[in-house]
Every structure is written in structure tokens, then in C-alpha cells.
Design a protein with these regions (language model features):
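Conserved beta-strand positions in the central sheet of alpha/beta enzyme cores
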Residues: 12, 37, 75, 121, ...
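Active-site-proximal loop/turn and secondary-structure-junction residues that shape catalytic pockets
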Residues: 15-17, 41-44, 80-82, 124-128, ...
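Active-site-adjacent beta->alpha loops and helix N-cap segments on the catalytic face
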Residues: 16-29
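Active-site acidic/histidine proton-transfer and metal-coordination neighborhood
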Residues: 49-155, 165
């Protein structure tokens, strides 16, 4: 309700298992706010071949949840997360093997997504600190995987926070893959707070993306520096650039 009052028309959330899906659906119907995407992850990793079958079954369940919410987008990470950081499989697989596993699992999932008109977004993440074992960390590698899967229902999510930490060159990386990027996450670096609190020049970046003809979703995924609602104007301002 607060999101609707602030002038936003869609939301995203992380995992669905601990959520009251019926209440979310009812609130969306009441406010006119839609669920644009949510995480389709649980305790399984795309990069571990031993998780493939479990991941396929979990995606089927996530798709049913998505349909309840009239949502057509799931977000997938290369590695799942534990309380202490991302699951680390470096002792089990080489990096090339992990990348092959991600490609394999997404290829298995793709026909299920296509049958249900659901899109899965692969999100490369940074491998700093407790997440040192993250297997897909760059836009270029994520794009290579998505192109190898070659499904209209498997695309790439560009998270500007992770991109800036891992390699920068944000605009060129997005533009060179714009055909497979329907979704962008926004947060500033270094602390993942709202736009304007760090080093990313959103006043340059967002107009350039919009001028390219981008028609996808731009989602604010940040930890507020202060009060959540107080941060809404800083986010809303970017839509007026």
C-alpha cells in the first residue's frame, strides 16, 4: 500500500516459501500494484549438477506460485545462499564445470518455462567476502550462458551494484547485451543504498538506457540508508530524468 501511495506500480520480492501468497495477491488486487518478479531459488544451486532434478521440481512449484500472483518472471542465482553466504562448490567442481552445470540446468528448465509462459532471469552476482564461491560473476559470462541456452524464456538480469563491483563499464555491458536483458536492478555502490548515496552516475546511465529503446523493467533493489519511505523520492526522481 505504501508503494502504491508513493507512485510505484510494481514490486519484487525474494523467496516465496515464507510468504503469505494469498495475502500478497489480495493486496495487489486492492492496490493495483503487481508483482513483477520474485526469486525462484531455494536450497538448490544451478551450478551443482547434483541439484538439477531438485531444481527442476522447485521451478515447477515456483511457476505455480507465479501464476497465483499473475507474475511471469522468476529470478535465478548461479549459487543458492546459506546463512553464512553463497553455497561454495569450488572444492567439488572447476569453474568451467560450474558454468557448464548452470547452462545444463537452465537448458533443462527452459521447456518448462516456455510451456508456462514464464521467463527466468539469470543474475550474475559478485564474489566478494562470504560470497567468494559465486560461480557466475560477470555480465559477459552470464550473457554467454543465456545465449548458449537459446530459449526465449531464459534471459539475463543486470544488477548495477554487482556489475560495478565486478567490472564496471555499465552502459557498454548493458548495451552489448540489450537483446537479452529485460530487467535491471538498481542500487548504489559501495553500500547498496538508494541511488545518489554512492559512486554510480545514475543521472547519466538511466537516460542513456532509456534512449536505447529499452522497454523492460527497472527495479530498485537497495537497503535504505535511513527510513524506507524517506528513500522513495530519490528513487522516484530517476523516472523523471
Amino acid at each position: 500500500e505504501k508503494v502504491a501511495a508513493a507512485g510505484f506500480h510494481a514490486v519484487e520480492f525474494w523467496g516465496w516459501k515464507d510468504k503469505d501468497i494469498t495475502k500478497i495477491r489480495e493486496t495487489c488486487e486492492k492496490t493495483g500494484v503487481s508483482v513483477r518478479a520474485f526469486s525462484g531459488m531455494e536450497k538448490y544451486s544451478l551450478c551443482d549438477r547434483d541439484h538439477t532434478e531438485d531444481m527442476v521440481e522447485w521451478i515447477k512449484r515456483s511457476i505455480q506460485t507465479a501464476k497465483m500472483l499473475k507474475c511471469n518472471t522468476l529470478i535465478l542465482f548461479p549459487n543458492h545462499f546459506t546463512p553464512s553466504g553463497c553455497a561454495d562448490f569450488r572444492d567439488k567442481y572447476s569453474h568451467d564445470a560450474m558454468v557448464a552445470n548452470v547452462t545444463h540446468t537452465l537448458t533443462r528448465i527452459a521447456p518448462i518455462l516456455e510451456e508456462n509462459n514464464i521467463t527466468a532471469l539469470l543474475e550474475p552476482l559478485c564474489n566478494t567476502g562470504a560470497d567468494a564461491g559465486m560461480s557466475v560473476t560477470s555480465t559477459a559470462l552470464g550473457a554467454d550462458i543465456v545465449r548458449a541456452v537459446a530459449s526465449p524464456n531464459v534471459k539475463l538480469l543486470c544488477d548495477l551494484f554487482h556489475m560495478q563491483i565486478m567490472h564496471g563499464n555499465l552502459l557498454n555491458n548493458i548495451m552489448s547485451n540489450i537483446d537479452i536483458v529485460p530487467y535491471i536492478h538498481i542500487a548504489d555502490v559501495p553500500d547498496r543504498h538508494e541511488p545518489g548515496t554512492g559512486e554510480i552516475n545514475f543521472d547519466f546511465l538511466l537516460p542513456a538506457i532509456q534512449e536505447s529503446g529499452f522497454e523492460g523493467t527497472i527495479c530498485f533493489e537497495y537497503f535504505p540508508e535511513g527510513d524506507t519511505e524517506a528513500g522513495f523520492p530519490a528513487a522516484k526522481r530517476l523516472f523523471d530524468l
